[in-house]
């Protein structure tokens, strides 16, 4: 009940602000930070016209951010002209407050394309940071 309600409220907030996406990514990720942080994840990009495509993401962050988390992730993708356009960097500001579990939503952008990660995670993390996610067709350890 509470988990479903929390997720529904986060998705509703995204739809009311940005409308209906033309793609979405379902996946999982792990992240950790002690002032400087790293995030790694993988999933599948789904679009109405082009089907599914495997994607990986990684990225650095810096800020007043401490702890670690593992999360199931749904990313709403807006204004994606082609599936290959996802393979670039998307910058944004993120804030997290996890104590055992929680939800989070942020918005990342590059030009007209907006990616809205919605995370449901477990861990212990508190803080705010600025950073980016880099989407790639293959997994890599290099977040830059």
Model-derived regions, located:
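Small-residue-enriched, tightly packed secondary-structure blocks
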Residues: 1-144
């Amino acid at each position: 009940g509470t988990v479903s309600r929390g997720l529904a409220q986060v998705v509703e907030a995204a739809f009311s602000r940005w409308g209906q996406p033309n793609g979405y990514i379902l996946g999982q990720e792990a992240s950790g930070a002690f002032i400087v942080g790293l995030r790694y994840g993988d999933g599948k990009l789904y679009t109405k016209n082009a089907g599914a495509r495997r994607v990986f993401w990684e990225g650095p962050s810096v800020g007043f951010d401490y702890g670690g988390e593992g999360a199931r992730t749904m990313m709403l993708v807006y204004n994606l002209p082609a599936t290959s356009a996802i393979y670039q960097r998307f910058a944004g500001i993120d804030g997290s407050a996890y104590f055992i579990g929680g939800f989070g939503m942020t918005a990342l952008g590059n030009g007209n394309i907006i990616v809205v990660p919605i995370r449901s995670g477990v861990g212990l993390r508190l803080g705010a940071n600025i950073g980016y996610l880099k989407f790639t067709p293959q997994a890599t350890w290099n977040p830059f």
